[in-house]
Swiss-Prot record:
Keyword Lipid biosynthesis: yes
Similarity comment: family membership: Belongs to the mer family. Phthiodiolone/phenolphthiodiolone dimycocerosates ketoreductase subfamily.
Record carries keyword Methyltransferase: no
GO molecular function, one term: oxidoreductase activity, acting on paired donors, with incorporation or reduction of molecular oxygen
Name of the protein this chain belongs to: Phthiodiolone/phenolphthiodiolone dimycocerosates ketoreductase
Pfam families noted in UniProt: Bac_luciferase
Entries under PANTHER family matching the protein: 5,10-METHYLENETETRAHYDROMETHANOPTERIN REDUCTASE, PTHR43244
Job description of the protein: Catalyzes the reduction of the keto moiety of phthiodiolone dimycocerosates (DIM B) and glycosylated phenolphthiodiolone dimycocerosates to form the intermediate compounds phthiotriol and glycosylated phenolphthiotriol dimycocerosates during phthiocerol dimycocerosates (DIM A) and glycosylated phenolphthiocerol dimycocerosates (PGL) biosynthesis.
One GO-annotated biological process of the protein: lipid metabolic process
CDD domains listed in its UniProt record: Tetrahydromethanopterin_reductase
InterPro entries, per the entry: F420-G6PD/mer, Luciferase-like_dom, Luciferase-like_sf
EC number assigned by the record: 1.2.-.-
Gene3D superfamilies noted in UniProt: Luciferase-like domain
Amino acid sequence: MAGFRFGFVDALVHTLFPPSLPARASIVSGAVLGADSYWVGDHLNALVPRSVATPKYLGVAAKVVPKIDANYEPWTMLGNLAAGNRLNGLRLGVCVTDAGRRNPAVTAQAAATLHLLTRGKAMLGIGVGEREGNEPYGVEWTKPVARFQEALATIRALWDSNGELVSRESQFFPLHNALFDLPPYRGKWPEIWVAAHGPRMLQATGRYADAWIPIVLVRPTDYSCALEVVRTAASDAGRDPMSITPAAVRGIITGRTRDDVDEALDSVLVRMIALGVPGEAWARHGVEHPMGADFAGVQDIIPQTIDEETVVSYAAKVPAALMKEVLFSGTPEEVIDQVAEWRDHGLKYLVVINGSLVNSSLRKTVSALLPHARVLRGLKKL
């Protein structure tokens, strides 16, 4: 397996700029800094409550992003980006697409198409999705994990069919003389990166995935324990457990000084990230999750229904110690040390969210750019 690598992910939110310009700028800067991949999210609307996506909390950025819930469709955008990406050479992927509202045959087709367009540089990130992108639109949400397991098995069945008719019983996605005849690129399909956290998801990762990319694990010890479950499942399925890339999606907040970092961590929008962490993580810090002790986390939030007063009250309850778990934060040297600890617990690939961009002060947002670049360069040396 290669040494430590990193990519980065952007939300595909509509801005005042031409639709693909922010993404293209990110790809160019990422290539300069040594990134391996560029990812885009897959959401119908934002995970940030629109009630606080305002100048009061976002500053000037709210003028650039006037509607936080206006999100572009990811596969369409990636197809557009692929045309100009050959010189940069970054791999392109969705982080992560939804096994609920997207039929797996359509997902298999989209990923295979992008793989051909990019000459073998497409990646399929996939997970259960979130309630906010399913239930409000009439998509059944009572068994998201079972639906995900069947979606993943369906994608593999279609890709492995060699153009032969496929029939397969399934509670959610039965196939009856189904046909999938797109070819792989030079004999290889896109890598499947699974956002898994619970036991059944981790087992499915070991059975079907090329990489594991959790989003809400908050401690390196949790990471290493879950990675062991993935590798055991891979062995049980007759696969090489070490062939599965251990990755993670994590936000990074850095700045020129520790005071700048602490100020950013204390903002309402950044503290809202902790709402996506399950109640058990809050309980370790002696605080009940404001949405309930048993709240599952990001997959069950419907942010468009949360008003400003409620958001602010929730943010005030977030323990400072929890904020330091849900993000890599600090000076560049401190952040690199934190990533190194995760590396020592098995992490080999980090997909970065630049949390330093979420700041009501334009000056401090700009001043964090160079420290963030120092972090990314430092990751290459891990």
